Regions:
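Bacterial N-terminal signal peptides
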Residues: 8-17
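C-terminal and inter-domain tail/linker signature
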Residues: 21-253
Length: 253
């Protein structure tokens, strides 16, 4: 059975309040459309266009800001890469995608990569957590991917679904396996696993012409030519000394 776990920047799992009326519930379509409504308001520099609570909390790159400040002033258009992690049970949705930011050298704006979390209560946004990565190559690489891998968009048959707790546990094993990597951990990868970092493939990269594939048993540095398990089992990711503040804000069941 394949485990399909999406690793994003994402906060402790919050259960939706049973006190909410059924009419106030926000399903998958509702949550994802709320992201679009937020982004439309964001690139128009107009918070009044978004369904915000009066006490909405907004952070950007870890800093508490007033709604309308920060990147609200500089983003000018939505990009083309879109990946949702939607959790109706928690009333939260995470989004990884691209935007365009005003740029004097480019009238169409410079591409940026964002990670976004919204908490939605009674169909209004009560929390906005935004990370902006101003790395044009990363944003361009994501857009070159076109759409997310089909497995991320495929509904897992009910009989094959993991529990919320096991999904989080498996995702956390990725970070635990990378932190102070020694090659002796448990690495739950499928044989055809691939890793992508900032939109670029970092596993199973074919050797260049005339180049010999590095041997994970004898190499002294890890290689992007190896598969996921080979990289982790090599013990050569030990330069990642700590992965802290691990948070799982959305579990897409």
């Amino acid at each position: 059975m394949k485990t399909r776990v999406l690793l994003t920047v994402v906060a402790g799992i919050l259960l939706a309040s049973p006190a909410f009326a059924q009419s106030d519930a926000c399903d998958r379509a509702c949550l994802e459309s709320t992201v679009d409504r937020f982004l439309d308001a964001f690139v128009k520099h107009d918070p009044s266009m978004a369904p915000l609570t009066r006490t909405v909390r907004f952070t950007e790159n870890g800093q508490r800001l007033t709604v309308g400040d920060g990147s609200w002033r500089s983003m000018i258009a939505k990009g083309t890469y879109r990946l949702f992690v939607t959790d109706p049970r928690a009333g939260q949705v995470a989004f990884i995608g691209t935007l365009r930011e005003e740029n004097q050298q480019n009238k169409d704006g410079a591409p940026v990569l964002i990670a976004l979390r919204l908490r939605v209560e009674r169909r209004q946004i009560s929390e906005i957590e935004l990370f902006v990565v101003r790395n044009e190559n990363a944003a361009k690489n994501c857009e070159k991917l076109g759409t997310p891998h089909p497995l991320f968009l495929e509904a897992v048959p009910p009989a094959e679904r993991m529990s919320r707790a096991d999904l989080v546990k498996t995702a956390n094993m990725y970070f635990t396996g990378m932190q102070q990597n020694d090659g002796k951990g448990v690495y739950p990868f499928t044989d055809d696993c691939n890793r992508f970092e900032n939109g670029g493939q970092s596993t199973n990269v074919p050797p260049k012409p005339g180049e010999t594939r590095a041997d994970p048993k004898t190499a002294t540095m890890y290689s992007s030519q190896w598969g996921c398990t080979e990289q982790f089992a090599s013990g050569l990711l030990h330069f990642v000394s700590r992965i802290r503040d691990r948070r799982y804000v959305a579990v897409d069941e």
